């Protein structure tokens, strides 16, 4: 039980690192939540701080989810504080990743007012199901490039993830996943565990729900478009 709690706490604290708020303070001396959309996430960092800072913020937010879901769980498996949790490891990684997402959304370091958690959730899934997530990222980038609406890309990507897992698992009969070997020593497991399918479906519904204001603005034509212009 102690090991499980330690995983949750460490993952939450990693997720709580307020990347965009720190970047706003360092680069412009501002609280990014008082500008743009008012959100402490990567998309608002692109709007307020420019594409370079926005890219760095987004990559760090993604890394928070990956680190929480894979290395943190792996570390405590190798160095448990008592018995290691007797549960499906993919489920444990998902729980740890979600602790990081909760930390990102309700960061203890910034008055529990953070971002929406999309990048951190994506990072968690990149660590657990990298091949499926590469496909999802491709769909996201294509949707954003064509529409210039990040919200459209986020919603379509959320819907695509459980569909891709289901198609690869049941249509192509790939079982619980595949292992990839790099440089003879580095192994990456691309999971297709059924926990991912259930989780992906829940996340898709949750992301559509959290983007309901964006959906209303899309239909009314008032949603902010992403500018690809050069801004430092």
Swiss-Prot record:
MF terms (GO), sorted A to Z: acyl-phosphate glycerol-3-phosphate acyltransferase activity
GO cellular component assignments: plasma membrane
EC id: 2.3.1.275
One of the GO biological process terms: phospholipid biosynthetic process
Catalytic activity: an acyl phosphate + sn-glycerol 3-phosphate = a 1-acyl-sn-glycero-3-phosphate + phosphate
Compartment(s) of residence: Cell inner membrane
TM segment ranges: 4-24, 56-76, 90-110, 124-144, 152-172, 191-211
Pathway where it operates: Lipid metabolism; phospholipid metabolism
Function: Catalyzes the transfer of an acyl group from acyl-phosphate (acyl-PO(4)) to glycerol-3-phosphate (G3P) to form lysophosphatidic acid (LPA). This enzyme utilizes acyl-phosphate as fatty acyl donor, but not acyl-CoA or acyl-ACP.
HAMAP family on file: PlsY (MF_01043)
Subunit structure: Probably interacts with PlsX.
Protein name: Glycerol-3-phosphate acyltransferase
């Amino acid at each position: 039980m102690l090991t499980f709690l330690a995983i949750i706490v460490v993952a939450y604290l990693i997720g709580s690192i307020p990347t965009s708020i720190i970047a706003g303070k360092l680069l412009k001396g501002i609280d990014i939540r008082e500008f743009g959309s008012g959100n402490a996430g990567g998309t608002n960092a692109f709007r307020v701080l420019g594409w370079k800072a926005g890219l760095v913020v987004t990559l760090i937010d993604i890394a928070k989810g990956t680190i929480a879901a894979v290395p943190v769980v792996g570390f405590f498996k190798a160095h448990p504080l008592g018995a290691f949790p007797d549960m499906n490891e993919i489920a444990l990684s998902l729980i740890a990743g979600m602790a990081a997402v909760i930390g990102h959304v309700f960061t203890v370091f910034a008055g529990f007012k953070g971002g929406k958690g999309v990048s951190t959730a994506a990072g968690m899934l990149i660590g657990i199901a990298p091949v499926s997530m590469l496909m999802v990222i491709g769909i996201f980038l294509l949707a954003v490039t064509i529409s210039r609406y990040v919200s459209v890309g986020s919603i379509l990507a959320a819907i695509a993830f459980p569909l891709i897992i289901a198609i690869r698992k049941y249509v192509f009969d790939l079982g619980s996943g595949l292992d990839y070997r790099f440089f003879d020593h580095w192994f990456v497991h691309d999971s297709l565990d059924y926990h991912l399918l259930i989780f992906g479906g829940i996340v898709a519904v949750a992301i559509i729900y959290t983007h309901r204001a964006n959906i209303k603005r899309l239909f009314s034509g008032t949603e902010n478009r992403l500018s690809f212009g050069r801004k430092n």
